[in-house]
Amino acid sequence: MAEPFFSVIVPAHNAADRIRKGLNSIKRQTFTDYELIVVCDDCQDKTAEIAHEYTQIVWEVGWHSCGRTRNKGLDLAEGQWILFMDDDDWWIEENAFQMIHDAILDGGEDFDVLAFGFHFGERGDAFQYHGKHYIAIWNKAWKREFLERIGARFPDVPHSDDVGFAEYTHPKARFRYLMAVLYDYNYMRPGSITHKLKTGELKRLEEMGLR
């Protein structure tokens, strides 16, 4: 069987109350040459059961580590390019994957990462991403061959594993940009660890002058 063009990796933790919106946004994509990988980390609810409604690639672990969970997704991935989605985020456009696919093909072979715009879900500000310095992994398509060649892995830390990943990958990567807002970053989910972490990421973004 030919490898899919995209592997979409979704790490999840007790996400039964929110994950459907993101999974539905993937299911609605007009471009269908992708595999969906959901890695459930210590889920005590029906997250895995819901994930099985959308994909056969559901892996359950008990690590309490988003970094290790994402690494498991990378281990399972067979796609040419990697996309990440948090369990409380979603894709805005139904043709998002098609737009990313077309931009990759138009770009030739001289880049490793395609970055695109994202939207802050609750604040209501559309933030157009123009540079490579924001640490997020979910507003980028990553060439799997590149990640494997440089041995890119997420650190096993309690939170902000994307910081270490960005510090390792960004200096080695060749970037290309798609000027379209495709991803909704729901950083304001109340009462959650994710909410606190994502608010911290917003502060780092503002400190770097990208906001």
What are these regions (language model features)?
Residues 1-209:
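Nucleotide-sugar donor-binding/catalytic module of glycosyltransferases
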